[in-house]
């Protein structure tokens, strides 16, 4: 703790300095791994988000992952308890092939059949996700509007276009596996969290995946009244983490 306080956080008032140092030490301790009787800390396992608004003491450590994302459909639940999380790095949409591009539809019945086939494909994807036991989907790529609709009807919370680094952090935090082929998705691939929740932070929404048992990746949300203050806090925190992790 004292080491953290003597880094760049020393530029702040005593109470704030202690507060940030405590978050820093707890974050490092949470992700530290013991190898050959030595503690190893991968700083990439501490995900830092910053958001203007509130006070410095609104900053917090989360035993899980914070995503600067909101759910893709307003009809989806805003929060999920006892979350089972599917981590998918492929698009949840109809696959377009060269054959599709060359199809010439001249009859209304043909068009109806074609659209029905596409809808059936999307519906089956969502049913496969649902059958795995997933009630949360984090997708690295896009999610088709129709897929959003069916997920919403099924009570699934979904996020699209998550960063690759966030997918990797989520896998570490939730003990889940990132999968490419939805047809192969099973309950064994799902990550676990006590809660997944969309929260209003400052002027926009963020998603908090919290209560991850034995999380090997954690998140810190840094707050401050102005952009300048938040940037300074981020620099101070990064400096302190670097010192503590040595």
Q: Model regions: which residues?
A:
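Core, soluble structural subunits of large cytosolic macromolecular machines
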Residues: 1-246
């Amino acid at each position: 703790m004292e080491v953290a306080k003597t880094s760049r956080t020393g530029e702040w008032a005593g109470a704030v300095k202690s507060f940030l140092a405590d978050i820093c030490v707890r974050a490092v301790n949470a992700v530290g791994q013991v190898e050959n009787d030595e503690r190893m800390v991968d700083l990439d396992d501490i995900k830092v988000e910053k958001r203007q608004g509130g006070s410095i003491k609104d900053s917090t450590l989360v035993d899980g992952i914070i995503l600067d994302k909101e759910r893709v459909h307003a009809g989806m639940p805003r929060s999920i308890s006892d979350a089972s999380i599917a981590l998918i790095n492929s698009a949840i949409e109809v696959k377009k092939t060269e054959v599709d591009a060359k199809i010439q539809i001249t009859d209304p019945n043909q068009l109806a059949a074609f659209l029905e086939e596409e809808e059936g494909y999307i519906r089956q994807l969502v049913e496969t996700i649902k059958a795995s036991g997933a009630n949360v989907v984090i997708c690295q790529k896009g999610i088709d509007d129709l897929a959003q609709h069916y997920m919403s009807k099924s009570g699934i919370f979904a996020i699209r276009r998550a960063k690759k680094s966030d997918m990797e952090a989520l896998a570490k935090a939730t003990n889940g596996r990132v999968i490419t082929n939805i047809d192969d998705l099973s309950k064994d691939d799902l990550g676990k969290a006590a809660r997944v929740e969309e929260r209003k932070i400052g002027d926009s929404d963020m998603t908090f995946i919290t209560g991850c048992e034995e999380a090997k990746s954690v998140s810190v949300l840094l707050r401050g009244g102005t952009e300048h203050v938040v940037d300074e806090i981020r620099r101070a925190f990064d400096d302190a983490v670097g010192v503590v992790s040595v």
